[in-house]
């Protein structure tokens, strides 16, 4: 069971962290015991008699100039001398090593260079290069080659970095590493090629969201998506639990670019009912999208396994969470295009978060025109205008929200269970709609019917839905 699997994994990781903390404590205890034994041995060397009248010092670094002590025969050593004598017991036998020397930037490996963007899709390069001479280095899609991309005369230009005999060059002299090559081109202002006359001016640093693969510790597989497997994991730096979406290396470049679309959308968002992006790993293959680990699993499975035990108020709170998240996306002109219970996640405290932004798009006018057929379109959740004309908008997301409401109050049932996708389209075009679930409040079913208005303009906004659901929930106290 995915929900139980994720919870079990979290408990395993907490146990591992506790065991590590115990090991550290045991090491500290052993160290203190060794110090105690050493101190005891020193005391035994002094014997049972009275302390000596003076401490024999090996040098004159400590002040003994107190005239009063001299007059008393030096029988009362100063506190500083006693401290020095005791601390000598624990003085390290070896001097500290010299401070580490900083590695010059040009000598750092390629993946540590700020201007190296890894498996960045070619289509995204133009968005990063803004001024003539701006450049970055990336991995060629589908090939084991490196590309130097630079903006010149208003157009991004792409140069394969030739590699032969362990030397790198666009043309002419070779260098032992790509960082050395880039450093030379920047310092000398030598053109990349004689024919192009292009010179490098400013390195474009990688996105702050970029993580190294080494920053992650992968755990067990917890799911599978359209692009590859989904794993649990943690950040090596602070043990933050994460979900890691992977992209199969065998997929063509255009599909890999679509995989990263989800991260591109989520970079801009911060909302308690939207799953949080932590970073992307694009420095090498396979590409990863790293997100917060929502430990309750997906909403559809949650409804089917836990729904019968939930109070109506809890169900209303959860669909209210969905409306709040979608209201936020609506304000950002973001069209989700795949809103469904399977694409929402549930925290351990039953907070719902909108997830799976792989089909999402941001459009300034709030309308997205899709092409390419219906192969990946979730027909039973999709509005008629999107199916018929490829026209997606927040209004088409509202239609899908109505199906999500129906899934919620039918406790995870499948919509149009006895109809194929084509039969569903014909049924809806003729005015057919899903019936009211047995446990659904009448006020909520009226909201569903508003979601399923055939004309997009007749459907309410998510803001209106959120307010109405809050009002309904208050009446169910």
Swiss-Prot record:
<feature type="domain" description="SH2">
    <location>
        <begin position="115"/>
        <end position="204"/>
    </location>
</feature>
<feature type="binding site">
    <location>
        <begin position="222"/>
        <end position="230"/>
    </location>
    <ligand>
        <name>ATP</name>
    </ligand>
</feature>
<feature type="domain" description="Protein kinase">
    <location>
        <begin position="216"/>
        <end position="477"/>
    </location>
</feature>
<feature type="binding site">
    <location>
        <position position="245"/>
    </location>
    <ligand>
        <name>ATP</name>
    </ligand>
</feature>
<dbReference type="GO" id="GO:0004715">
    <property type="term" value="F:non-membrane spanning protein tyrosine kinase activity"/>
</dbReference>
<keyword id="KW-0597">Phosphoprotein</keyword>
<dbReference type="GO" id="GO:0005524">
    <property type="term" value="F:ATP binding"/>
</dbReference>
<keyword id="KW-0547">Nucleotide-binding</keyword>
<keyword id="KW-0418">Kinase</keyword>
<feature type="modified residue" description="Phosphotyrosine; by autocatalysis">
    <location>
        <position position="368"/>
    </location>
</feature>
<dbReference type="InterPro" id="IPR011009">
    <property type="entry name" value="Kinase-like_dom_sf"/>
</dbReference>
<keyword id="KW-0067">ATP-binding</keyword>
<dbReference type="InterPro" id="IPR050198">
    <property type="entry name" value="Non-receptor_tyrosine_kinases"/>
</dbReference>
<keyword id="KW-0829">Tyrosine-protein kinase</keyword>
<dbReference type="InterPro" id="IPR020635">
    <property type="entry name" value="Tyr_kinase_cat_dom"/>
</dbReference>
<keyword id="KW-0808">Transferase</keyword>
<dbReference type="InterPro" id="IPR000719">
    <property type="entry name" value="Prot_kinase_dom"/>
</dbReference>
<keyword id="KW-0553">Oncogene</keyword>
<dbReference type="InterPro" id="IPR017441">
    <property type="entry name" value="Protein_kinase_ATP_BS"/>
</dbReference>
<dbReference type="InterPro" id="IPR000980">
    <property type="entry name" value="SH2"/>
</dbReference>
<feature type="active site" description="Proton acceptor">
    <location>
        <position position="338"/>
    </location>
</feature>
<keyword id="KW-0727">SH2 domain</keyword>
<dbReference type="InterPro" id="IPR036860">
    <property type="entry name" value="SH2_dom_sf"/>
</dbReference>
<dbReference type="Pfam" id="PF00017">
    <property type="entry name" value="SH2"/>
</dbReference>
<comment type="similarity">
    <text>Belongs to the protein kinase superfamily. Tyr protein kinase family. Fes/fps subfamily.</text>
</comment>
<dbReference type="InterPro" id="IPR035849">
    <property type="entry name" value="Fes/Fps/Fer_SH2"/>
</dbReference>
<dbReference type="InterPro" id="IPR008266">
    <property type="entry name" value="Tyr_kinase_AS"/>
</dbReference>
<dbReference type="Pfam" id="PF07714">
    <property type="entry name" value="PK_Tyr_Ser-Thr"/>
</dbReference>
<dbReference type="InterPro" id="IPR001245">
    <property type="entry name" value="Ser-Thr/Tyr_kinase_cat_dom"/>
</dbReference>
<feature type="region of interest" description="Disordered">
    <location>
        <begin position="49"/>
        <end position="76"/>
    </location>
</feature>
<feature type="compositionally biased region" description="Basic and acidic residues">
    <location>
        <begin position="58"/>
        <end position="74"/>
    </location>
</feature>
<protein>
    <recommendedName>
        <fullName>Tyrosine-protein kinase transforming protein Fes</fullName>
        <ecNumber>2.7.10.2</ecNumber>
    </recommendedName>
</protein>
């Amino acid at each position: 069971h995915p929900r139980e699997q994720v919870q079990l994994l979290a408990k395993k990781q907490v146990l591992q962290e506790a065991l590590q903390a115990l090991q550290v404590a045991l090491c500290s205890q052993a160290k203190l015991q060794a110090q105690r034994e050493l101190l005891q041995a020193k005391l035994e060397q002094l014997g049972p008699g009275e302390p000596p009248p003076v401490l024999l010092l090996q040098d004159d670094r400590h002040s003994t100039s107190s005239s009063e002590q001299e007059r008393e025969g030096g029988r009362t050593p100063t506190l500083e001398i006693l401290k020095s004598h005791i601390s000598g017991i624990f003085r390290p036998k070896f001097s500290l090593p010299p401070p580490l020397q900083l590695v010059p930037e040009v000598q750092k490996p390629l993946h540590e260079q700020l201007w190296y963007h890894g498996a960045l899709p070619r289509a995204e390069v133009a968005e990063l290069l803004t001024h003539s001479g701006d450049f970055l280095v990336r991995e060629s899609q589908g090939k084991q080659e490196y590309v130097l991309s630079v903006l010149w005369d208003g157009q991004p230009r792409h140069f394969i970095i030739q590699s032969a005999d362990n030397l790198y060059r666009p043309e002419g002299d070779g260098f032992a590493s790509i960082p050395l090559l880039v450093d030379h081109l920047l310092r000398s202002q030598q053109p990349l090629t004689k024919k192009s006359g292009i010179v490098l001016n400013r390195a474009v640093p990688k996105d702050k969201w970029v993580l190294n693969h080494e920053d992650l510790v992968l755990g067990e597989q917890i799911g599978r998506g359209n692009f590859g497997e989904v794993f649990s994991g943690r950040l090596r730096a602070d043990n933050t639990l994460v979900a890691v979406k992977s992209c199969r290396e065998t997929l063509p470049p255009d599909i890999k670019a679509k995989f990263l679309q989800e991260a591109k959308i989520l970079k801009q968002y911060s909302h308690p009912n939207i799953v949080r992006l932590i970073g992307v790993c694009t420095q090498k293959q396979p590409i990863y999208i790293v997100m917060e680990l929502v430990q309750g699993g997906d909403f559809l499975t949650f409804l089917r396994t836990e729904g019968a035990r939930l109070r109506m108020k809890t169900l209303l709170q959860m669909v209210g969470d969905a409306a709040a998240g979608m209201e936020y996306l609506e304000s950002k002109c973001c069209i989700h295009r795949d809103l469904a219970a399977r694409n929402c996640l549930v925290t351990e405290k039953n907070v719902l978060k909108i997830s799976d932004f792989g089909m999402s798009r941001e459009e300034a006018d709030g309308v997205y025109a899709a092409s390419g057929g219906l192969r990946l379109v979730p027909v039973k959740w999709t509005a008629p205008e999107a199916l018929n004309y490829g026209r997606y908008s927040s209004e088409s997301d509202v239609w899908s929200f109505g199906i999500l409401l129906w899934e919620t109050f039918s406790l995870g049932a499948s919509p149009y269970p006895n109809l194929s996708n084509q039969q569903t389209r014909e049924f809806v075009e003729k005015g057919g709609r899903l019936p009211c679930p047995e446990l659904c409040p009448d006020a909520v079913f009226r909201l569903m019917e508003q979601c399923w208005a055939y004309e997009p303009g007749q459907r309410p906004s998510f803001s209106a839905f959120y307010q109405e659901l809050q009002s309904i929930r208050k009446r169910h106290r």
